[in-house]
């Protein structure tokens, strides 16, 4: 499993909105500038997040985007699944109802299923708020005079 640029940028965009939620609607150009991501690229990600009701859009002057819910309501897993489709480490675990033709005889299937569970459990238990809190704690710990 390799997380694409789209997935990483979607996560960074959501984190930026979480960090600036007190600012109300945030312009895409501001997110792009702070995150050093092309505005055009973010424009491709917005519809994915918007369609799934992760973002609220406001058009016109003072327009922009904001999170629909609190940062603690969004997990890394949910954001990455929107942009990546699935997070399975091997193709035989993809959303295929038939599965692999060797499924019943595969000696490594339990290994891949276990890895898939570890990945899902990890990503589904980290929220945007957790990441922000961790970042702030690390920033305070690294402060020196």
Residue spans of the language-model regions?
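Short, hydrophobic-biased segments on the C-terminal half of alpha helices
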Residues: 46-47
């Amino acid at each position: 499993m390799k997380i694409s640029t789209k997935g990483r940028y979607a996560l960074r965009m959501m984190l930026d909105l979480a960090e600036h939620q007190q600012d109300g609607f945030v312009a895409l150009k501001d997110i792009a500038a702070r995150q050093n991501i092309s505005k055009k690229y973010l424009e491709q990600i917005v519809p994915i997040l918007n369609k799934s009701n992760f973002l609220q859009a406001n058009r016109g002057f003072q327009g922009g985007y904001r999170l629909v819910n609190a940062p603690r309501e969004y997990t890394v897993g949910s954001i990455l699944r929107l942009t990546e489709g699935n997070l399975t480490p091997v193709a035989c675990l993809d959303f295929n109802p038939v599965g692999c033709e060797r499924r019943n005889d595969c000696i490594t299937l339990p290994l891949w299923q276990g890895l898939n569970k570890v990945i899902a459990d990890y990503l589904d238990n980290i929220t945007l708020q957790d990441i922000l809190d961790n970042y702030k704690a690390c920033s305070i710990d690294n402060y020196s005079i």
